[in-house]
Amino acid sequence: YGDHRDLHSFPTRRSSDLVSFDARAGEILCIAGIDGNGQTEFIHALTGLDKNNGGTVTLCGKDISHASIRRRGECMSHIPEDRHKHGLVLDFTLEQNLVLQRYKEPEFEKGGFIKKDAVRAYAERLIEEYDIRSGQGPVTTARSMSGGNQQKAIIAREVDRNKPLIVAVQPTRGLDVGAIENVHKELVKQRDAGKAVLLVSLELDEVMSLSDRILVMYEGEIVGEFDPKQITVQELGLYMAGAKRADKKEGETA
């Protein structure tokens, strides 16, 4: 990955214009905007949850515009907005959820059978490393865990996959202060390790404190690109609300 710059562009459902940008290694790029302005459609097109109806999505130097979710996952980790719908299988155990995307790998499967001891050892390592608290350890059902620990489990699973791009969508929604701090620390740690982190957030404080670069989305379009050190919270809020816009010249990447 290194200095490679990836371009992700596609038309959102709210606009005929293209959303075009690059996510760089070693930075947290934040897509900021008020809920309902195309962020969900954008993420679904990027991650493969919805079909990409036009434009291109390039990742790790490959066009993945029409690739399956599994193929996209070869270069991308995804911390989804809805941890219950897209992040966990609530009636599965914690250890089953932690290997959801990896159970076919030789480490965990042989001859069509799951290596239960390997899965257990892997889950116990992640539980310890990421301080995932659950009443019965690896065999705890995901449904019975607190929201903060459910989110820790998702982050542990996605980060441990060690992919060059981490897509984190509203990763602190519904969490308490302590859990929010843990999520923020992990995203910064991954940025510092050279990963590209794409953060989608509605929270102004979160956007300003974590981002190296900010793109504001309004009605399905990128209406401004900012350095968080050079814009105030108040001004950023105006862009997010559509009261201001910093239009790019035609053909310029936003």
Residue ranges of model-derived segments:
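Glycine-rich phosphate-binding loops of nucleotide-dependent enzymes
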Residues: 13-254
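Short, small-residue-biased leader/transition segments that mark boundaries at the very start
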Residues: 1-4, 8-15
